[in-house]
Design a protein with these regions (language model features):
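C-terminal active-site subregion of NodB/CE4 polysaccharide deacetylases
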Residues: 1-11, 17-21, 55-56, 60, ...
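Short beta-strand segments
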Residues: 37-38, 66, 104-108
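Short, acidic/turn-prone active-site loops that include or flank metal/cofactor-
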Residues: 38-43, 131-135
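Histidine-centered divalent metal-coordination motifs
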Residues: 68, 72
Length: 147
């Protein structure tokens, strides 16, 4: 694909069961690449995907699982220690259930403090906020925009 050709990236948050029932069959059939950001606390609860469903989609080579915290709380209101504890708890749960910790992070509600970003920068390969914009080589890879 020529470099100047425009590309898109599909990102999905939260791991809702409706994604698995409605969107997953289409994405799978057409092998459309995407990242799904999972918060670990709601997994298996009413309205959310189970770990078996997450493992099913994760095995496809066009799917990336992303880290989206444990609680999906509005973490910008938490202390840095609470943020780190929440993130590390999710990391342990990911390791137990899918065998690795995702290297891509999405801030719940798209916001982060400087301290949160510093922590994510040290522990992940890149991260997404939730502000509009295009991604190019000049973007900060730890505050990538998306709609």
């Amino acid at each position: 694909m020529p470099k100047q050709q425009k590309k898109i990236l599909i990102t999905i948050d939260d791991g809702f069961e409706s994604f698995y029932k409605e969107a997953w069959p289409y994405l799978k059939k057409n092998k459309i690449p995407f990242i799904i950001f999972i918060s670990t606390k709601p997994v298996g609860k009413n309205g959310y995907m189970t770990w078996d469903q997450i493992k099913e989609i994760e095995k496809e080579d066009f799917v990336l699982i992303g880290h989206h915290s444990h609680t999906h709380d509005y973490l910008i209101d938490k202390t840095i220690e609470e943020f780190i504890n929440d993130t590390e708890k999710a990391s342990r749960i990911f390791l137990k259930n899918i065998g690795y910790v995702p290297s891509i992070y999405s801030y719940p509600f798209g916001e982060c403090s400087k301290e949160m970003k510093d922590y994510i920068t040290r522990n992940f390969d890149l991260s997404f906020g939730q502000h509009s914009g295009v991604i190019d080589v000049n973007k900060d890879k730890f505050e990538l925009p998306r709609f």
